[in-house]
Amino acid sequence: MTKNIFLAVAAVAALASCKKDPTLDERLAGTWNLSDLSLSGTVTTPIGALPITITDSLIRANNTLDLAINEDETQTVVWNMDVRALITAPGLGSFGTDIQDTINGTWYAVDGGGVTPDSLYITADGEKTGYEILSFFETSLRLRSVETIVDPDLGSQTFTQEVTFIK
């Protein structure tokens, strides 16, 4: 009898310890606070290509990326951005501007399995943007995206954006 009780307790303990590892989506879910923002690219002008950089000079309160996994298993995102940025271009100098935006949409992550980088995809207003996960720890997340903007007057502009979040 004691042997059967011991085996039952051991079986329950073994089953309890067999908890599956959280998925990349589950590990990313939560509220992240923006701590760093930078963009770089080249703008085509009538006098030629002009390299520019944009860096944050002031990150205001409530700059959050909220990645939620809802009870119905949908995954929603709300990204609030309110940053004072410094734009720098050779020959033009530097000037400040405000970057304010709220993105509402859906998201999913792709685990690269150690072969390719992990990725985060956000879809908002019918457009999907992919972010390479450069680094991801329990309390920090660094993302990079490369986006091409097509302007009817200036043509195609490509920008690289890197953002860092902390919990």
Give short role names for the model-derived ranges:
Residues A14-S17:
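C-terminal motif of bacterial Sec signal peptides marking the signal peptidase cleavage site
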Residues M1-N4, K19:
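Positively charged n-region of N-terminal signal peptides that target proteins for export
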